[in-house]
Amino acid sequence: SGGLDSTLALLVCVKTFDKLGFSRKGIIGITMPGFGTTDRTYNNALHLMSSLGITTKEISIKEACIQHFKDIDHDMTNHNVTYENGQARERTQILMDYAILKIR
């Protein structure tokens, strides 16, 4: 997301790959823009991934979240916990599924 937790996790991965002598291209940084993603955070994430020399991938979560909110009859103008958590859960689902896909 470009936030502090994501940034620190990425830096730990990079340091670990460097210590083990692995290519940083083996790290896949995924940016998942959603409804709250600002240009600043989006560009910060892209710049960080590029400057570290890792592989980058972008997967928008917007359409998946729209479908989810429709499925549960949630009004998207209501930016409550359901709205926020729906986006967080979609990101988690993508990361878990992508990781499993890549290790098989």
What are these regions (language model features)?
Residues 15-22, 67, 74, 97, ...:
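Conserved helix-loop functional segments at active or binding sites
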Residues 1-21:
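A phosphate-binding catalytic loop at a beta-strand-loop-alpha-helix junction
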Residues 83-87, 91-104:
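Long hydrophobic segments that form regular secondary structure
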Residues 6-9, 38-40, 92:
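Short glycine/serine/threonine-rich phosphate/pyrophosphate-binding segments
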